[in-house]
Amino acid sequence: MGSRGLPPLLLVLLNCYTSSSTQVIAIPAAATPAVTKEDLNSTKATPTTLQPSLSPRTPGTPRAPERSGPRPTPVTDVAALCVCDLLPAQCDVNCCCDPDCSPADFSIFSACSVPVVTGDRQFCSQKAAFYSMNLTADPPHRDFKLIDQINPSVFCIHISNYKPALSFANPEVPDENNFDRLMQTSGGFTLSAESAVPSTAASDGPQPTKYEYGAPLQTAGASSGSFLKLPSPLTSSLCADQNPAAFLVSQAFECSRRVDIEQCEGMEALSMAHYSSPAILRVPNSMTQVSIKIQSVMYRSLNHTLTQLEGHGVLRPSLVSTGQDRLCSNVVLQVKYSLLYTATGQIHEAGLSLVLGTLSSAVSLLQQKFEIHFIQHGTKPVPLSGNPGYRVGLPLAAGFQPQKGSGIIQTTNRQGQFTILRSTSQQDCLASEGLRTPVLFGYNVQSGCQLRLTGTIPCGLLAQKVQDLLRGQAFPDYVAAFGNSRAQDVQDWVPVHFVTYSSNMKGSCQLPVALAIEVKWTKYGSLLNPQARIVNVTAQLVSVPEPLPGPERTVVISTAVTFVDVSAPAEAGFRAPPTINARLPFSFFFPFV
């Protein structure tokens, strides 16, 4: 009997058995016939193979991995890259990858300036173009090879076929034609004085436990908003009330405000309570509040006289009528905050100083001043003699250096850092011992006294006594070059040159009689706002032979301070005239040189 096909019922049972079975049958790859394009398009019947069908897969059976297709074509063609092609539509000398060069140009090349051109070295496999010159051939010609390079690194890029990712996209510049379309795609924009970030977003991260430099000062209460406001001018001279005060940023602003005299009682910016009512948070996002204490209130009248108000409360603007004119009193003119902070970044105390005044109906623009200063708690502010240059009439900042490389040590008494002998009505040097006067910048001073001598005082002891009288207890070694020079910045201090002058008489006792101090200073900075800077300090101690012996002798002791301006005359600065910096091409004289 010839072979017959299986009965239809048996085939159905076999299919049901294989679809419900959980056994996985591995089929060798060699037994799987290769499927070509012709097989897929063919309409001929193929012989039936007695094996389980893989198309009906149960949910628990893993899918066989699919074979990946061919690699995409790289978007970067290294054969078309040329980094030495600088001249457009011209052949660059010794640039073997220049597409503008012909075989005749290659024949006169001496070498290839760029022998290897590669793409991104982070790829696992990349093309590399090698260029070389065959100078032994006649005529010389260029050799080109394109090879594959393998990156041995484990972390490498397999393939990159997304061309837009290889360069930055040019943003579309808004104009009158595409502005509406860009507004629709971007979703528009909003301007709001308050932060649009939800309050829940701030609670996700760790809460700050201190204020950092430049952080806005947070306040409690809805009347003043979230931050302490310090009005300031923005694009114009008008006051903008949404400027937050920043931690450790001392600022001073002056701006104008449009005022309607009939509405002055209802304007918060003119009320004293608007600036004293906010409570500053000791640290950000805390429950501890620091109230603002009113330290002083000055009242300025219409004729600009100032009067300090005592025992006052919170004054509010009040509109009064005086004949045909209407006045608004208790209007805030100046606001000054003084904040004490600790080294841990906390607000310790807040003070407020105000200047109130009267506003007339003839004034439509009100000038207001706002200041804020930060002072560290537990430290006393050091008075300065200028910022940065010296101011006339302020004492010189001086001190001494205990050892080389250390900072300058100053006394806490600013008036006693650099002093000279003070003249008294008695003109007695011994009676005026210990009385000193500070050296003030810009003031030429001369002082003196009389010393009555007797024959019982030895000359050596007397000379030391007079020298101590002229120099004082602590004569400084350094003087600050600027009025705000810091003690740790030794380069900003000028040494005091102490010179002693005495007669040439041998065998005689030299008695100091005069101390001449010369301070040379110059104008530093811009001509519009020059700053006084000390450049040299010289102290000359003049000694003379002891007077002839006698029952009673009188010696005049004097001290002089002179300030000398050594500023160079101002010269106008001009820009240097332009010069021609032309260079010939590298092969200009080729082949002669």
Curated annotation (Swiss-Prot):
Question: Which keywords appear in this protein's UniProt record, sorted alphabetically?
Answer: Cell projection, Cilium biogenesis/degradation, Cytoplasm, Cytoskeleton, Developmental protein, Glycoprotein, Methylation, Secreted, Signal
Record InterPro entries: Tectonic, Tectonic_dom
List, alphabetically, the Pfam families matched. Answer: TCTN_DUF1619 (PF07773)
UniProt GO cellular component terms:
ciliary transition zone; cytoplasm; cytoskeleton; extracellular space; membrane; MKS complex
- GO term, biological process aspect, one: cilium assembly
- Residues spanning the signal sequence: 1-22
State the deletion phenotype. Answer: Null animals show disruption of nodal flow, laterality defects, and neural tube dorsalization. Basal bodies dock to the cellular plasma membrane, but fail to extend axonemes. However, cilia are present in the notochord, early gut epithelium, and mesenchymal cells surrounding the neural tube and in the limb bud. Null embryos develop an extra preaxial digit on 1 or both hindlimbs. Although sonic hedgehog (Shh) expression is normal, downstream signaling is disturbed, suggesting that Tctn1 is required for cilium-dependent Shh signal transduction.
Sites carrying a glycan are: N41, N303, N536
| PTM sites of type Omega-N-methylarginine | R486
Q: Where in the cell is it found?
A: Cytoplasm, Cytoskeleton, Cilium basal body; Secreted
Chain spans, region Disordered: 37-72
| Transmembrane spans | none
Polar residues biased stretches: 42-58
Quaternary structure, from the entry: Part of the tectonic-like complex (also named B9 complex).
Protein function: Component of the tectonic-like complex, a complex localized at the transition zone of primary cilia and acting as a barrier that prevents diffusion of transmembrane proteins between the cilia and plasma membranes. Regulator of Hedgehog (Hh), required for both activation and inhibition of the Hh pathway in the patterning of the neural tube. During neural tube development, it is required for formation of the most ventral cell types and for full Hh pathway activation.
Family of the protein in this entry = Belongs to the tectonic family.
Q: What else is known?
A: Was named 'Tectonic' after the Greek word for builder.
- Protein name according to UniProt: Tectonic-1
Q: Which organism is it from?
A: Mus musculus
Gene label = Tctn1
